[in-house]
Amino acid sequence: MTTHDIYERLRERIDSYSIGMNATGNGKELAILKRLFTEEEARYYLALTRALEPAAVIAGRLGVSAAEAEKVLERMCAKGHLFPKTADGVKLYAAAPFMHGFFEHQVYRKDRDPELPRLIEDYLMGGFIPKSRALRVVPVGVGLPDRKQVLPYDDVRGIIMSKERIGLMHCACNHHMKSLGHECGQDTEVCIAFDFYAEYPIEQGFGRWIRREEALKVVERAAERGLVHQAGGDSRNVECICNCCSDCCGILRMLKRVPNAGRFLSSNYTPAFDAGACTSCGECAERCPMGAITVGDGVELNADRCIGCGVCAVGCPAGAVTMQKKPDDLVRRPPSPEKYTFMRSSIDFRADQEAAKGKG
């Protein structure tokens, strides 16, 4: 097998995970992989799955000893290729997809290849096509109707209050853009993760445990600062709440380039403007991350561009913006497990760990 074949097979495997890593025809994706993986590491990745497994199982697929496999797998963990975990003293490994996975992990590496950010940026903005939705917009709490009428999966406060294990980390997208010389001026410690996705960054040294009260303050300040709440997870479990600025977030930056962003990413709410209360100050238009609002004699909303984040409602000094629930036939519910691939559920990772107990 030639070097090109190895890396193309690696790309194909990564493309089958999460939102993929499509071929561009210009080789940008292969340039990234060659910077990230040695040929040996590429072969090891091809022997892994998204499920957590012990080194002995992976070694069996490769025809090497468990000790030899563990040595390479640990090196790959240090490079951000894998999700590691331990069960009953047995180290387990799972393949990390491009996103959410080794893209984010690279950001926090102190020994990161200095050429990598530019290569990744060129790929993201010059050919990357996500295979499926990654996150969903959750509206801010301001301007919503009676909280009792808000669906549980649209309630940021409710999601946080339902969680026991909460982690906070610096925004990977913000760090990525900083490495390219772009400073947006926003808060950076704004990404909240739960369960497995909180444990991993904290174990790797780039996150910290927080209480619910601090998490609530993070999302409240994020909303005030004009950041968009985006949640990840399937219908069983919310895995994270990212608080994103449209200058840095890869998803929002890509959507800003299309005229109908709301078709691809939107909450279950849409802003309504009270013409009597509105002073035409323009604050809502200035805050809108998608440029969906224009203000003249009144306020005009481009519904195709609106993602229903509610940032306009938070910033309105006159309180003239409320968030109205969309008709039931337009409501998007969190996807079922078989239809959501961006973040493998903490529930499934926990099942892997339980299955591995007693096998060491």
Across the structure, where does each feature detected by a protein language model lie?
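Short, amphipathic alpha-helical interaction segments positioned at domain boundaries
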Residues: 90-126
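Flanking helices and flexible, charged tails adjoining ferredoxin-like Fe-S electron-transfer domains
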Residues: 303-360
